[in-house]
Amino acid sequence: RDVERSRGLGDVYKRQIEHMLFKGTDNRTAIEIAGEMDGLGGNLNAFTAKECTCYYAKVLDEHLGQAVDILQDLVQYPRLAPEDLSREQGVVCEEILMVEDSPEELVHELLGSAIYGESPLARPILGSQESVRAFTPDRLRAYMARRYQLGQMVVACAGRVDMQTLLPLLEAAFCKGEKALPAPGEDMPASQLLQGQRFVAAQKDVEQTHICLGFPGFPTDTKEQFALYVLNNALGGSMSSRLFQHIREERGMAYSVYSYPSGYSGTGYFALYAGTEGKQGAKVAELMLQEARRMR
């Protein structure tokens, strides 16, 4: 686990497991999972973020029980077959290459590395091709045994929901008489923003320069984050925002320009982004800073 901590492999495990859970379980093949959900006219998907993985289904209320059963099957009885893992490692490696070939995506990964240095939050969720190729089914199972526990699970349900129907379904699917154990400690203490100015760049043979400027923000568990959401909407989070109006609409110097907050447990940052012609990069960065200062 020391190696995992130092390299921030927790995120990579999460992403690989997310892919693998749709490849079949002890009770359903991959095509049966897809066919059963399609037969309900529903949607089954997942996503991995820096601090969580979410598996979700969207169905008619009359199919709630089947949706819970499928989700339970995915997270509790994954097949994790070696041949499936080998194929999926190739898929994830191709996804890594896709990000490398997309400067508009890559620049946000570079911003994270500049802000968080050697902490796990600096690492891309997809990992590297080397780390992805190193996984085995046993390593994935060990990670799931440690992390996919009742004490770390959060269930959310919205829509036409009858709680008297839902709760027994969830208890039967996930509790089974077991008590929720305390969640194990995090792989790494909450990361702090690096101090001082930092600059990271990647040279790509493309037409545009993609710029991200990062500033200290707020953790997800603070009241200040809500004020930051309001500020974001005014600065770069909408078509009427200052960045959009002054850089795109008035000057025509960028097609894509925006801002966004990024919060985690114990830390967070605020970012500005623009993609522009190379020779305009310095000027656009200056204009972005000017608009940010005007918000004071």
Segments and roles (model prediction):
Residues P182-S241:
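His/Glu-based metal-binding/catalytic segments typifying zinc-dependent metallopeptidases
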Residues F244-Q245:
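Phosphate-proximal small/polar/acidic motifs at interfaces that engage nucleotide phosphates
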Residues K14-T25:
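Active-site SXXK
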Residues D2-Y13:
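Single conserved hydrophobic/aromatic residue that forms the stacking wall/gate
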Residues T25, R79-L80, M239:
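Short helix-capping/linker segments at secondary-structure and domain boundaries
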Residues A30-P184, A190, A201, F218-P219, ...:
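Charge-rich, well-structured scaffold segments of protease-associated domains
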